[in-house]
């Protein structure tokens, strides 16, 4: 009788160990799968940030550049008049036009900063691309962790391959090695 109780206890303990191993392996696979999904969502969020931010940045820079172009055009036209002036009166008149153009321009646009805007644009673009690259790198790391787990010896025996398929990491699209053109 004692031998049968000991055998039942050993079988129960063995069954409990197997069940705990199975549940631990399964739960880790689920956790890794969710981490992969979250990581991909981070990549998508970085792409969405770029899609939302870049057009706004370009419009800001284009607006600043347009304002400065208007100022430069007015000053250049007035200055051309001075060069072509025949008399001192003409020279004085075009000088006043230059001063008026400059004063009006600076009153309308007290801080002419298109160069700073372009530098800000460049910094924002670089930061955005760095965020995307970091999200892709993190995604690939979570894929590696997930795939390593599901391909482990005991894990492979325990898990259903259809429920936990191998995942592919981020791969650049064809032509991605070429820098995109930016036109103003």
Task: Write out the residue ranges for each language-model feature.
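A helix-centric hydrophobic-segment signal that preferentially recognizes long
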Residues: 1-184
